[in-house]
């Protein structure tokens, strides 16, 4: 059902509830599941897993992948075309994707500060080869090179036109009375 939602456009984005807790912290709930801290790491491998199970299998096109991982979120958060597009005047935040690259996901090699990975041992086809942030290469061929504090606030104007379009669509889908 989720794949059909992405394919049809009823689901516009993909995300993770990225909230890392180490195995010892998770073990706090071994006798009472209510004490298990919620969340797990997922943001680092989200795009790889989505490409592998989506584009590589034919469930999604490359354009749909870009939409659900970037463009749609930028539109929803009203930062498009500054974010979510490669165009004149846009921020130079770009992921260069190698659709043929393969990788086996492991906690031993990930960048997250947690001692396990929910995708441990999964081999995926399709990975980022380079990432640029503000025009600077911050990831290349498996090596991360970021400066602490290099991020910056991105102003979000209110009232994205995206929501207006959703309201118009909802109005059009309302039942219309038939006079008899």
Describe each PLM feature range.
Residues 28-32, 88-153:
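C-terminal cap of metal-dependent C-N hydrolases
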Residues 63-64, 105-112, 165-167:
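Short, positively charged
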Residues 7-14, 19-101:
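His/Asp/Glu-enriched, well-ordered alpha-helical/loop segment
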Residues 141-180:
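Intein/HINT protein-splicing elements and their conserved insertion hotspots or analogous self-processing inserts
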Residues 41-44, 122-127, 158-161, 165-168:
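Short, surface-exposed, polar/charged, turn-prone segments marking secondary-structure boundaries
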Residues 1-2:
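Phosphate/diphosphate-binding loops
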């Amino acid at each position: 059902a989720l794949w059909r939602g992405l394919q049809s456009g009823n689901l516009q984005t993909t995300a993770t509830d990225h909230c890392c807790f180490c195995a010892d912290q998770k073990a706090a709930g071994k006798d009472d599941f209510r004490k298990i801290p919620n969340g797990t790491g997922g943001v680092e491998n989200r795009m790889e897993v989505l490409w592998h199970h989506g584009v590589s299998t034919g469930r999604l096109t490359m354009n749909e992948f870009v939409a659900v991982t970037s463009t749609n979120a930028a539109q929803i958060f009203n930062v498009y075309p500054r974010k979510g597009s490669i165009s004149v005047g846009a921020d130079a935040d770009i992921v260069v994707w190698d659709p043929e690259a393969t990788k086996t996901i492991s906690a031993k090699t990930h960048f997250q500060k947690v001692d396990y990975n929910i995708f441990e041992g999964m081999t995926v086809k399709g990975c980022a080869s380079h990432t640029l942030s503000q025009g600077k290469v911050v990831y290349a061929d498996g090596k991360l090179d970021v400066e602490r504090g290099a991020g910056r606030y991105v102003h979000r104007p209110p009232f994205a036109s995206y929501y207006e379009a959703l309201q118009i669509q909802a109005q059009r889908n309302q039942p219309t009375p038939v006079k008899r």
